[in-house]
């Protein structure tokens, strides 16, 4: 259910955009993200920092989009969020406190150098997606950008996740059997 909840604002944004326009879709995105945060809080009793950052960015850039009736703000939101994620990953790695290791290290045992590579890989991935978003958002029609945001970036993120998981599993430390002798 939590994974479906992560996609709820995106699905609502896309649907409302197709039915109405970018400005109504932006308002719907703000509302859907607020509902997402409320559900996460009441059902799981916890809201992750990533969700809070996303909510803040959606609210700020969505409000600017609506106030100035300029879709450039909502387009920039994607790149700014990805940039913030890349910076957070880079800083966490520089401080030897990998965010990715903190998230997955209990389930997957791997050497610190593997976690460092995966962390840097994700930071570069987010930078690449941010740059790609700027290109698509400001060089191609709005319809193309919306499709790219919803389907392209989602597919790229899923592919990156699969690649990362395979890489970690390939280099994971074997489970130690405490029952042997």
Curated annotation (Swiss-Prot):
Subcellular location per the Swiss-Prot or TrEMBL entry: Cell inner membrane
Regions that span the bilayer: 22-42, 50-70, 72-92, 118-138, 148-168
Short name of one Pfam family: IspA
Membrane topology, record value: Multi-pass membrane protein
Keyword hit for Oxidoreductase: no
InterPro entries (alphabetical): YciB
UniProt keyword tRNA-binding, yes or no: no
Main location: membrane
GO cellular component: plasma membrane
Keywords annotated in UniProt: Cell inner membrane, Cell membrane, Membrane, Transmembrane, Transmembrane helix
Summary of the function given for this chain in its UniProt record: Plays a role in cell envelope biogenesis, maintenance of cell envelope integrity and membrane homeostasis.
Similarity comment: family membership: Belongs to the YciB family.
Designated name of the protein: Inner membrane-spanning protein YciB
């Amino acid at each position: 259910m939590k994974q479906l909840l992560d996609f709820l604002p995106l699905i609502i944004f896309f649907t409302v955009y197709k039915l109405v326009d970018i400005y109504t879709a932006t308002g719907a995105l703000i509302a859907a993200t607020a509902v997402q945060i409320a559900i996460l809080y009441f059902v799981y009793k916890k809201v992750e920092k990533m969700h809070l950052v996303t909510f803040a960015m959606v609210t700020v850039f969505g409000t600017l989009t609506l106030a100035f009736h300029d879709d450039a703000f909502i387009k920039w939101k994607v790149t700014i969020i990805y940039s913030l994620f890349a910076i957070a990953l880079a800083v966490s790695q520089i401080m030897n406190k990998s965010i990715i290791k903190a998230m997955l290290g209990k389930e997957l045992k791997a050497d610190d150098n593997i976690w460092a590579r995966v962390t840097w890989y994700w930071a570069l991935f987010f930078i690449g997606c941010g740059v790609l978003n700027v290109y698509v958002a400001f060089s191609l029609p709005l319809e193309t950008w919306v499709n790219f945001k919803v389907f392209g970036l989602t597919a790229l993120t899923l592919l990156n996740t699969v690649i990362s998981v395979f890489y970690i599993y390939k280099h994971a430390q074997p489970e130690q059997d405490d029952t042997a002798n």
